[in-house]
């Protein structure tokens, strides 16, 4: 039998991937995580809105309206959920959509909430339909409607819940059902970060890690971090390793540049995977337009990986366009690879 490559097999984590790579990285993220809105850097519009809504809820002595946070991974949705709970002065219970398999799983969480507590559900777009159905009355009326028993003996039991705030986070807002989306009173989209905000985040993390780093070093890391704080902090740790060996632990612009070049992260934050994708569109498909399935087959990646991991940053940075006819490389992509621009 012919052996074929398993394109869905687990692959090594990219250093510029926005997803959390390991439990160890998760622990370090928690240590570097800001605790208040004042400490939270960037996302100025979302932060300003949340500050007003939180103050208003506290002034009235009410639970904050349910909050939906959406945007690409690594931009601070989990951090904001923790900050919301801290600013409100209440407890936070955290779970994720895939974990809540049965209605009873959600019921157990909801019935253990104290008044005004925050329930944070990450990947809320992955809730099962059964769980989502019992969530509706909980969000609207602070009430659980649970069916007990089966067949003719089945009966509905209503359980009153304390007022609470659901904070849902998702990278795929389009996958939320309309009834669920409509039950969020506050909806905030998190955007990719500006380099100046990322440089501030890198400098703050360096201080917490007690690193000797110049302003130029922070800026060099920031501009290659793909607009994502999680990536910036990961690159900072790898640059720290390089500096410990090559420069007695001091991180300046030159050391940061040398370290990141060694890691194949170029000045635009593109890594080998990004360049492979763009080169396929440019060289194998004449710059496009090309269908997603075709380019996925050409580079040996799943369409989900391309849509969720590779494309968002390339589109945001103007290297790629999505058109009704397929993906197309932009003028900036041609120039980045030193190619003549197609007219």
From Swiss-Prot:
Pfam family, one: RuvB_N
Keywords attached to this entry: ATP-binding, Cytoplasm, DNA damage, DNA recombination, DNA repair, DNA-binding, Hydrolase, Nucleotide-binding
Gene3D superfamilies according to UniProt: 1.10.8.60, P-loop containing nucleotide triphosphate hydrolases (3.40.50.300), Winged helix-like DNA-binding domain superfamily/Winged helix DNA-binding domain (1.10.10.10)
Catalyzed reaction equations: ATP + H2O = ADP + phosphate + H(+)
Span list, region Head domain (RuvB-H): 267-343
Entry GO terms, CC: cytoplasm; Holliday junction resolvase complex
Enzyme Commission (EC) number: 3.6.4.-
InterPro entries: AAA+_ATPase (IPR003593), AAA_lid_4 (IPR041445), DNA_helicase_Holl-junc_RuvB (IPR004605), P-loop_NTPase (IPR027417), RuvB-like_N (IPR008824), RuvB_C (IPR008823), WH-like_DNA-bd_sf (IPR036388), WH_DNA-bd_sf (IPR036390)
Residues holding Mg(2+): 78
The protein's assembly and partners: Homohexamer. Forms an RuvA(8)-RuvB(12)-Holliday junction (HJ) complex. HJ DNA is sandwiched between 2 RuvA tetramers; dsDNA enters through RuvA and exits via RuvB. An RuvB hexamer assembles on each DNA strand where it exits the tetramer. Each RuvB hexamer is contacted by two RuvA subunits (via domain III) on 2 adjacent RuvB subunits; this complex drives branch migration. In the full resolvosome a probable DNA-RuvA(4)-RuvB(12)-RuvC(2) complex forms which resolves the HJ.
NCBIfam families in alphabetical order: PRK00080.1 (NF000868), ruvB (TIGR00635)
Role played: The RuvA-RuvB-RuvC complex processes Holliday junction (HJ) DNA during genetic recombination and DNA repair, while the RuvA-RuvB complex plays an important role in the rescue of blocked DNA replication forks via replication fork reversal (RFR). RuvA specifically binds to HJ cruciform DNA, conferring on it an open structure. The RuvB hexamer acts as an ATP-dependent pump, pulling dsDNA into and through the RuvAB complex. RuvB forms 2 homohexamers on either side of HJ DNA bound by 1 or 2 RuvA tetramers; 4 subunits per hexamer contact DNA at a time.
Protein name: Holliday junction branch migration complex subunit RuvB
């Amino acid at each position: 039998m012919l052996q074929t490559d398993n394109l869905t097999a687990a692959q090594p984590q990219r250093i510029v991937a926005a997803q959390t790579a390991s439990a160890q990285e998760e622990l370090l993220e928690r240590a570097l995580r800001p605790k208040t809105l004042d400490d939270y850097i960037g996302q100025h519009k979302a932060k300003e809105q949340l500050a007003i809504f939180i103050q208003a809820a506290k002034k009235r002595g009410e639970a904050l309206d349910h909050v939906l946070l959406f945007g690409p991974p690594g931009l601070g949705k989990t951090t904001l959920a923790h900050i919301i709970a801290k600013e409100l002065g209440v407890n936070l219970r955290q779970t994720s959509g895939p974990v809540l398999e049965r209605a009873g799983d959600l019921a157990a969480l909801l019935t253990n909430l104290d008044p005004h507590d925050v329930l944070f559900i990450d990947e809320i777009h992955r809730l099962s339909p059964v769980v989502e159905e019992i969530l509706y009355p909980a969000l609207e009326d602070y009430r659980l409607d649970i069916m007990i028993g089966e067949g003719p003996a089945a009966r509905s039991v209503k359980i009153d819940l304390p007022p609470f705030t659901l904070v849902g986070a998702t990278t795929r807002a389009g996958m939320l059902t309309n009834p669920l989306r409509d039950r969020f009173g506050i909806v905030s989209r998190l955007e990719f970060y500006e380099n100046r905000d990322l440089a501030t985040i890198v400098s703050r993390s360096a201080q917490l890690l007690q690193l000797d780093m110049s302003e130029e070093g922070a800026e060099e890391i920031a501009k290659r971090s793909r607009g994502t704080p999680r990536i910036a902090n990961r690159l900072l740790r790898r640059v720290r390793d390089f500096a410990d060996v090559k420069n007695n632990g001091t991180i300046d612009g030159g050391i940061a540049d040398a370290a990141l070049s060694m890691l194949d992260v170029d000045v635009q934050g593109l890594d080998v995977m990004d360049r492979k994708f763009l080169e396929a569109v440019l060289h194998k498909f004449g710059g496009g337009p090309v269908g997603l399935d075709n380019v996925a087959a050409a580079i040996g990646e799943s369409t989900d990986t391309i849509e969720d991991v590779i494309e968002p940053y390339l589109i945001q940075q103007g290297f790629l366009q999505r058109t009704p006819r397929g993906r197309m490389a932009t003028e900036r992509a041609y120039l980045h690879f030193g190619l003549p621009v197609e007219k």
